[in-house]
Amino acid sequence: MFWFDAVLLGVLEGLTEFLPVSSTGHLILLGAWLGHQSEAAKTLDIVIQLGAVLAVVVYFRERLSTTVRGMVRRDPDSLRLALALAFAFLPAAVVGLLFHKAIKAHLFGPGPVAAALIVGGFLMIGVESLRRRRPDQGAPRVEDVTFQRALAIGFAQCFSLWPGASRSMTTIVGGQLSGLSTAAAAEFSFLLAIPTLGAATVFDLVKNGRALLDAPGGIVALVVGLAVSFAVALLVIAVFLRYLKRYGLAPFGWYRIALGALVLWLWIASRSAPAEAGAASASPAPRGDVAAAVDGLARTGDHPSRP
């Protein structure tokens, strides 16, 4: 594991974790392009999201501090927000634990990732079209997230277990459809990332953390990846919230459709290659050969997972 790989992964994680474009899908493709096959490398793909979680904590530190103090004082708004986050967290946590192996076996491949990117892109464009026809008049505050809305967002987040769907996309769209304003849906999505991504990272560390720590340069790669993902994610959060208010979700929808179509085309092209290339493609893909990387994903089915 080279530290430069950790920098690339950290930049990509920070850029895509909170954008509705699927960080998992992007990391799967970058990891294959870099030739990551070891358990340590794949664990790093998951663990560096702690940097993004820390960025949320820092960016929303005033909100979090106010909520914690309010819970101590039994402030109704603070208690409602904390319980809403817990309600929204539970569905994906339960589904992830129950179906983790099945999801990894059947959905972690270029075909499912491409399909999720394309379907999610059309969904975002459709929701954005509805929103533009009806001005954003949803509940304006995250404190307005009722338990019913929280459960709706939580069940929507379950679809993010499908690599390529995007946790950010499913929770923001779920919030909008449940009656929240775009701003409130986005803020709730960011806050929900703290328990969701934190739990996913702890789960993977417990299972595979030793492989990363024992790997040559593993600790250095972890520190570098965390630092880079934190710095990039902190910038992305601020820019994305302003961008979302002005332009909405549609541009990200078109990006998802274009990327999904490209991945699907590369995957189909690699699978239709001459049969004699099969033996070579079963080995780790060389750096820079994107088509071979996509084909390697299809053949091995061995990818980083997020429970």
Swiss-Prot record:
Main location: membrane
EC number: 3.6.1.27
Group of enzyme by EC: hydrolase
Compartmental location: Cell inner membrane
PANTHER family with a match to the protein in the record: UNDECAPRENYL-DIPHOSPHATASE
Misc: Bacitracin is thought to be involved in the inhibition of peptidoglycan synthesis by sequestering undecaprenyl diphosphate, thereby reducing the pool of lipid carrier available.
Name of this protein: Undecaprenyl-diphosphatase
Gene from which this protein is expressed: uppP
